[in-house]
Amino acid sequence: MNETKYFEYNRKLWDERVESHKNSKFYNVKDFKAGKTSLNATELSEIGDINGKSILHLQCHFGMDTISFSRMGAKATGVDFSDDAIDLGRELTKDLKTDTCFISANIYDLKEQLDSRFDIVFTSYGTVGWLPDLTRWAEIVSHFLKDGGMFYMIDFHPVIWMYDNKSWDIKYSYFNSGAIREEVHGSYADRYHQNVAIEYGWNHSISEIINALINNGLQIKFLNEFPFSSYNVFQDMVQGKRGQWHFKSQGNNLPLMYSIKAVKR
């Protein structure tokens, strides 16, 4: 199967998720509209002050984080390949009277629709695992950064994607061995939603991610790994005193998230 077909399946999946995600407790749009940020303490502390800065948010879904950046004083642009998600993002920014910009595009094709450079490029929680080619991804990141601009990403650790979450047997390679096809029921935000869909993803090691960025002119400032998740998105998770999640059967033995900060040289 070619890349276009993979993206067609995944775009259909994400289009179908928009309505259930909008109404889910996970996204809690009601409290968001009332002023609550959708960003977590980890990324907020690592990104720092963004007031007055321009931010490009890649793979933004329906843009709650993007709008949160606008509320913090940034000039924020969100990009996603789901037309339905972008439509909802535009609806939210209109309702909330923020100046957030949204673009519907596959990030590999973004140069055809956007001719700007940004102080910050940001991506989070469900990013490179949806992309087959990290060299092209990192080139896009570098292209849209101003010289001296900052790239920041935070995501679920690739070690997690090796395991069968029920049996804890190793099911997939840590390294990119090609597209992984899965039949999914519901989603992380609405596990009881009735839709059944096919998705395609790719495992990428930390070294593959880091080297793709370095090879495209970015200097790594830090790589952090965390023994917790900001979200309850896997089975067998319990919440700790600080509101962070970890696997009940694994404790703090596995890295669940990582973050990277880099600067364009």
What residue ranges belong to the model's regions?
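Core SAM-dependent methyltransferase catalytic element
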Residues: 216-218, 243-265
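Class I SAM-dependent methyltransferase SAM/SAH-binding core
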Residues: 54-110
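Residues lining the SAM
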Residues: 123-125, 154
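Short alpha-helix
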Residues: 189, 200-223
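Conserved class I S-adenosyl-L-methionine
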Residues: 1-51, 64, 68, 150-187
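A short glycine-rich, Lys/Arg-flanked "PGG" loop and its adjoining helix->strand segment in the class I
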Residues: 135-150
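A short acidic, Gly/Pro-enriched loop at the edge of an enzyme's catalytic core
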Residues: 112-121
